[in-house]
A protein has these predicted regions:
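ATP-dependent phospho-/nucleotidyl transfer catalytic cores
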Residues: 1-33, 43-49, 55-66, 70-71, ...
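Catalytic-loop Lys-Pro-X-Asn motif of eukaryotic-like protein kinases
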Residues: 37-38
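Metal-dependent nuclease catalytic cores in nucleic-acid-processing enzymes
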Residues: 74-84
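Short, polar/flexible loop-turn hinges at active-site or ligand-entry regions and domain interfaces
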Residues: 85-93
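A structural motif corresponding to the C-terminal end of an alpha-helix
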Residues: 109-113
Length: 164
């Protein structure tokens, strides 16, 4: 919040998402670490996931450290958000509908349920919030004109998962 004042308004609610995870035992395994739509290819025989090198700015030891697979799910959830936010030719409501359809289909396939997930499961919501906060900092430093994308996502997420 010090570097990006716009985060200050979300700090308490985001911390509540993280605090809800304290003491929980979460499954961990080797993960992709930088999973987003740009790391997928559609071939004749289906979808392929590429570039398992992890987050480029992390050390090799950090990239090899087991983590929750929900970190990769959160990365893809946020990737759908970026795709929707930058789509042209669609009304804002249609972009949001497309994003929610993609997120619910993807997460539903990951957890084998048809129930809407983001905003209802505090574990995944915390990982999505963590990714969105990272994106706010990234955009602030590198693409300030895009900072609204993760800020809007963070606003929607904390509105779903918490109350003041």
């Amino acid at each position: 919040a010090d570097e990006v004042p716009a985060l200050a308004g979300h700090e308490r609610r985001v911390r509540r998402l993280f605090d809800a995870l304290r003491g929980r035992e979460l499954a961990s395994q080797r993960i992709h670490g930088d999973f987003h739509l740009g790391q997928t290819l559609l071939g004749r025989d289906g979808w392929h996931i590429i570039d398992f090198e992890g987050e480029p700015l992390k050390s090799l030891a950090e990239r090899r450290r087991p983590d929750s697979p929900l970190r990769d799910v959160a990365g893809m959830v946020r990737s759908f958000g970026y795709a929707a936010a930058t789509a042209t030719g669609l009304a804002p409501a249609d972009r949001e509908d497309w994003e929610l359809t993609c997120v619910n289909a993807f997460v539903g396939a990951c957890v084998d349920t048809d129930e809407p997930f983001v905003g209802r499961d505090d574990t995944l919501s915390a990982y999505v919030a963590d990714k969105a906060v990272y994106e706010v900092l990234y955009e602030h430093r590198n693409r300030p004109d895009w900072i609204h994308i993760p800020l809007n996502a963070l606003e929607r997420l904390v509105a779903l998962g918490t109350s003041d």
